UniProtKB/Swiss-Prot annotation:
Photosystem II (PSII) is a light-driven water:plastoquinone oxidoreductase that uses light energy to abstract electrons from H(2)O, generating O(2) and a proton gradient subsequently used for ATP formation. It consists of a core antenna complex that captures photons, and an electron transfer chain that converts photonic excitation into a charge separation. The D1/D2 (PsbA/PsbD) reaction center heterodimer binds P680, the primary electron donor of PSII as well as several subsequent electron acceptors. One of its GO terms (biological process) is photosynthetic electron transport in photosystem II. It is a multi-pass membrane protein. Its main location: plastid. Keywords: Acetylation, Calcium, Chlorophyll, Chloroplast, Chromophore, Electron transport, Herbicide resistance, Iron, Magnesium, Manganese, Membrane, Metal-binding, Oxidoreductase, Phosphoprotein, Photosynthesis, Photosystem II, Plastid, Thylakoid, Transmembrane, Transmembrane helix, Transport. A quinone binds at residues 215, 264-265. This is Photosystem II protein D1. Fe cation binds at residues 215, 272. It comes from Chara vulgaris (Common stonewort). [CaMn4O5] cluster binds at residues 170, 189, 332-333, 342, 344. The modification N-acetylthreonine is found at residue 2.
Amino acid sequence: MTATLERRESSNLWGRFCDWVTSTENRLYIGWFGVLMIPTLLTATSVFIIAFIAAPPVDIDGIREPVSGSLLYGNNIISGAIVPTSAAIGLHFYPIWEAASLDEWLYNGGPYEMIVLHFLLGVACYMGREWELSFRLGMRPWIAVAYSAPVAAATAVFLIYPIGQGSFSDGMPLGISGTFNFMIVFQAEHNILMHPFHMLGVAGVFGGSLFSAMHGSLVTSSLIRETTENESANAGYKFGQEEETYNIVAAHGYFGRLIFQYASFNNSRSLHFFLAAWPVVGIWFTALGISTMAFNLNGFNFNQSVVDSQGRVINTWADIINRANLGMEVMHERNAHNFPLDLASVEAPSINA
């Protein structure tokens, strides 16, 4: 009898826990994805803050030349970063217990791998939590689909690119100047500016900014005034009101006359789908581009210069880009390589033969 009561009580306890986790009445929804998201993101955030402030220098290139990234070792907010895991570790899973000591783990950049892997798991669970909450509320699932774009981008630079290049040391440093350094080196080694998928990403980001500004300004300019001239127009809106808060016909008419009729949406639903889809698809393509360049399927190159009938080079913009890429590659890991990889490789065949 006692065992039966204990079993029933424990099952009730588990049931109450399940109800609490999946309840949409909580101030912040937890959900089953949140059960994994909360500890992983807390771990990533805590280790990032501690390492950004106090981590010792890391031997990023595996050549016994440690690079300092923390504030206590001479950096500021701009130059500081979590330095990626050493090339000596490569792609090995490197938790604290795999190192001989904590000092060795820090010297080899263990915190970077710890932060990145927990962060990626955490943001993936955040995306799942968005879907889960939408499901519980009877909403459509497109919020999680939209969030998949930044998740894909983060996964590309923190996981797919290191896998393709063979080492976590090639991942993006976790800092402001480290991000810019990653971008410059990426251009030098992969010519990303000449990759069509990056171009689509640029169109997505800048186009999304343009469309967001256009939409916001059109709505703000065509509000249906519910207040006097002495009050803010914003005060005329009541949360949850059934009436339209702006005149979409007026906005449609304005924009249709500003450009041409069919450049303007007359359907609010298709308009907002477009506003969401444009940047999301662009960032998807950029993440896909990073993932292909990770395995050295690079942007277009024009290594063969245009020459005249006498064999003299006719300089084009491609030649300037090539020279800039070589210059950036020479400066990258200057003590790890004697020559940039392009100059050390076999000479390109002549096209005059």
